[in-house]
Swiss-Prot record:
Protein name per the record: Deoxyhypusine hydroxylase
Signal peptide: none
Phenotypic consequence of residue 57 to G: Loss of deoxyhypusine monooxygenase activity
Gene: DOHH
Intervals holding HEAT-like PBS-type repeats: 23-49, 54-80, 87-113, 175-201, 206-232, 239-265
Residues the record lists as binding Fe cation 2: 89-90, 208
Keyword Acetylation among UniProt keywords: yes
Species lineage: Eukaryota, Metazoa, Chordata, Craniata, Vertebrata
Organism: Bos taurus (Bovine)
Length: 303
């Protein structure tokens, strides 16, 4: 049983800028797992932080929780042009993940936002909400991953056809995302390599999602492409960030070398992502039971 005092202590860790970023991330994911209005309130309070990486992750977690009570704060973040593009983008995606049609018109409004990552995200969220309306809600068949995705996986099963759809930049972004998630769900080396080819496509939003799904797959075949994207200083920081976190999740020795090489990167979101990814690497290669260990750390402060 989790006490209110414990939830508050985890929340205090999240909102305390004096805490190491890794500890704040673990607190965030602990709150996400706990759920409920108190957890949402603590997560919402951290949107005035100066770390774009942390704020982006706050929005991501609120979307994954799929709790309507998070809609007002996510709308505020989407509307706030002082927030970094990657934060506003994640708020738009989170609104799509929650799946409530009440936000459809607002998402349509921001589908023409001057920030292209925000506009494309809201276009995808609109398509997702429309798809949910047409198909009577979420699919009853769950894939191998627990995440709430910006698009449902395509029904096509042929990897060659899916690769072709993924890389065809003339197709609607929503359809390419559907191919992306179908390849992820298929798993294996061929699917991972097909996805890794997407890191060369034109849309930064698309490339960043490729990095995300490769991190979910944790297939080492994609390590060279992820490391190359991370090492490219002209690549969009949002893409480099996802590639860093993917390398942390894959957790092979080559990943460790790539992350250490960029832990002092001049781009803040990249170096912070490498810090968090190194913490994830430690978790993946260690004996810790779970990453979201905020409660365990409270109960065993010496560990």
């Amino acid at each position: 049983m989790v006490t209110e005092q414990e939830v508050e202590a985890v929340g205090q860790t999240l909102v305390d800028p004096g805490q190491p970023l890794q500890a704040r991330f673990r607190a965030l994911f602990t709150l996400r797992g706990l759920g409920g209005p108190v957890a949402i309130s603590w997560i919402s309070r951290a949107f005035d932080d100066d770390s774009a990486l942390l704020k982006h992750e706050l929005a991501y977690c609120l979307g994954q929780m799929q709790d309507r009570r998070a809609i007002p704060v996510l709308l505020d973040v989407l509307r706030d042009t002082r927030q970094e593009p990657m934060v506003r983008h994640e708020a738009g995606e989170a609104l799509g993940a929650i799946g409530d049609p009440e936000v459809l018109e607002i998402l349509k409004q921001y589908s023409t936002d001057p920030v292209v990552e925000v506009a494309e995200t809201c276009q995808l969220a609109v398509r997702r909400l429309e798809w949910l309306q047409q198909h009577g809600g979420e699919s009853a068949v769950r894939g191998p991953y627990l995440s709430v995705d910006p698009a449902p996986p395509a029904e096509e099963r042929d990897l060659g056809q899916l690769r072709e759809a993924l890389l065809d930049e003339a197709r609607p972004l929503f359809d390419r995302y559907r191919a992306m998630f179908a390849l992820r769900d298929a798993g294996g080396k061929e699917a991972a390599l097909a996805l890794a080819e997407g890191l060369r496509c034109g849309s930064a939003l698309f490339r960043h999602e490729i990095g995300y799904v490769l991190g979910q797959m944790q297939h080492e075949a994609a390590v060279p492409q992820l490391a190359a994207a991370l090492a490219q200083p002209t690549e969009n920081p949002m893409v480099r960030h996802e590639c860093a976190e993917a390398l942390g999740a894959i957790a092979r020795p080559a990943c460790l070398a790539a992350l250490r090489a960029h832990v002092a990167d001049p781009e803040r979101v990249v170096r912070e992502s490498c810090e968090v990814a190194l913490d994830m690497y430690e978790y993946e290669t260690g004996s810790t039971f779970q990453y979201a260990d905020g409660l365990e750390r409270l109960r065993s402060p010496l560990s």
